[in-house]
From Swiss-Prot:
InterPro entries: Chaperonin_GroES, Chaperonin_GroES_sf, Chaprnonin_Cpn10_CS, GroES-like_sf. GO terms for cellular component: cytoplasm. It comes from Francisella philomiragia subsp. philomiragia (strain ATCC 25017 / CCUG 19701 / FSC 153 / O#319-036). The keyword Cytoplasm applies. It is found in: Cytoplasm. Together with the chaperonin GroEL, plays an essential role in assisting protein folding. The GroEL-GroES system forms a nano-cage that allows encapsulation of the non-native substrate proteins and provides a physical environment optimized to promote and accelerate protein folding. GroES binds to the apical surface of the GroEL ring, thereby capping the opening of the GroEL channel. This is Co-chaperonin GroES. One of its GO terms (biological process) is chaperone cofactor-dependent protein refolding. The keyword Nucleotidyltransferase does not apply. The gene is groES. Belongs to the GroES chaperonin family. It holds the Pfam family Cpn10. The lineage of its organism: Bacteria, Pseudomonadati, Pseudomonadota, Gammaproteobacteria, Thiotrichales.
Length: 95
């Protein structure tokens, strides 16, 4: 299955979860926090404005992004869990 986001939506692959804490303690599944950064894998065409024009997207495929802890909705694509979110949910592009 292939997904193309519509309008200002972005499909993000979450970064790998940390299995060790900063102090070196191995974390179990329930203790691990889901990362709030990832890589953009697909973007929509942009947000439709009231005047009918389309505002271009600031993010592009391949960008590493930072987003809120509860941003987006999980979607399953080819046995992989990805996040679908609006561009407004993205706080910044990493580096």
């Amino acid at each position: 299955m292939n997904i193309r986001p519509l309008q200002d939506r972005v499909l993000v692959r979450r970064a790998e979860e940390e299995t060790k804490s900063a102090g070196g303690i191995i974390l179990t599944g329930s203790a691990q926090e889901k990362p709030s950064q990832g890589e953009v894998v697909a973007v929509g065409n942009g947000k439709k404005l009231d005047n009918g024009s389309t505002q271009p997207m600031d993010v592009k495929v391949g960008d590493k992004v930072l987003f809120g802890k509860y941003s987006g909705s999980e979607v399953k694509v080819n046995d992989e869990t990805l996040l679908m979110m609006r561009e407004d949910d993205i706080m910044g592009i990493i580096g």
